[in-house]
């Protein structure tokens, strides 16, 4: 069993979402010393946006892929291989303009791919990533959970569900830009929520 850990904030050591995802990983590894962790830093090392060559390759019948088209999918293949190899996902995603950072949107575009993470049949679309768990930790300047301006959680739930991931947990650290007291309360609340998710995953995951 493997854990896939993604950060998408470009803020480096100042990032709250990074510190929160790291807390989860540290707690998880304390209980599962031998569980490998795949780490990808989308904030510092963003994946490229998909382009015309990528689209042509992704929808080309596999038997007709040329070396050039195969090359266009190399990064996508690598990212999807990481997804398939892991059973548990921890994603740190700050809210930017009521949604996700561009780095995470580019990541989603690379991994949502026909015949790899979903298939199309006479019955419609079917996601291929079964029996996975994902924890999404978001950081937000204000309070948006359940509000019309929250285009982040509904979007991510829809995308993850489309590729087959339905066991999705969100922890929202909100009001981080309101004031120091609100900020500290939000971080402390997120720490408690992370500890609870670790306990829940521990009780429901066979290692």
UniProtKB/Swiss-Prot annotation:
Its EC number is 1.6.5.-, 1.7.1.17. Keywords: Flavoprotein, FMN, NAD, Oxidoreductase, Plasmid. It is an enzyme of class 1 (oxidoreductase). It catalyses: 2 a quinone + NADH + H(+) = 2 a 1,4-benzosemiquinone + NAD(+); N,N-dimethyl-1,4-phenylenediamine + anthranilate + 2 NAD(+) = 2-(4-dimethylaminophenyl)diazenylbenzoate + 2 NADH + 2 H(+). Gene3D superfamilies: 3.40.50.360. FMN binds at residues 9, 15-17, 139-142. Binds 1 FMN per subunit. Its cofactor is FMN. InterPro entries: Flavodoxin_fold (IPR003680), Flavoprotein-like_sf (IPR029039), FMN-dep_NADH:Q_OxRdtase_AzoR1 (IPR050104), NADH:quinone_OxRdtase_FMN_depd (IPR023048). One of its GO terms (molecular function) is FMN binding. Quinone reductase that provides resistance to thiol-specific stress caused by electrophilic quinones. Also exhibits azoreductase activity. Catalyzes the reductive cleavage of the azo bond in aromatic azo compounds to the corresponding amines. Homodimer. PANTHER family: FMN-DEPENDENT NADH-AZOREDUCTASE 1, FMN-DEPENDENT NADH:QUINONE OXIDOREDUCTASE. Belongs to the azoreductase type 1 family. This is FMN-dependent NADH:quinone oxidoreductase 1. The lineage of its organism: Bacteria, Bacillati, Cyanobacteriota, Cyanophyceae, Nostocales.
């Amino acid at each position: 069993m493997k854990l896939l850990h993604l950060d998408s904030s470009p803020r480096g050591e100042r990032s709250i979402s990074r510190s929160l995802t790291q807390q989860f990983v540290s707690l998880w590894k304390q209980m599962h010393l031998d569980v490998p962790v795949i780490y990808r830093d989308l904030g510092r090392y963003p994946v490229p946006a998909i382009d015309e060559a990528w689209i042509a390759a992704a929808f080309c019948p596999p038997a007709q892929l040329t070396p050039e088209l195969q090359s266009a999918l190399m990064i996508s293949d690598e990212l999807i291989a990481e997804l398939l190899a892991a059973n548990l996902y921890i994603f740190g995603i700050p809210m930017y303009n009521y949604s996700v950072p561009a780095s995470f949107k580019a990541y989603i575009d690379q991994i949502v791919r026909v015949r790899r993470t979903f298939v199309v049949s006479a019955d419609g679309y079917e996601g291929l990533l079964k029996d996975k768990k994902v924890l999404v930790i978001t950081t937000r300047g204000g309070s948006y959970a359940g509000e019309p301006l929250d285009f982040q959680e509904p979007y991510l739930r829809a995308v993850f569900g489309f590729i087959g991931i339905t066991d999705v947990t969100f922890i929202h650290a909100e009001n981080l830009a309101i004031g120091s007291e609100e900020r500290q309360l939000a971080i402390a609340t997120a720490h408690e929520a992370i500890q609870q998710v670790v306990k829940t995953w521990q009780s429901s995951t066979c290692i």
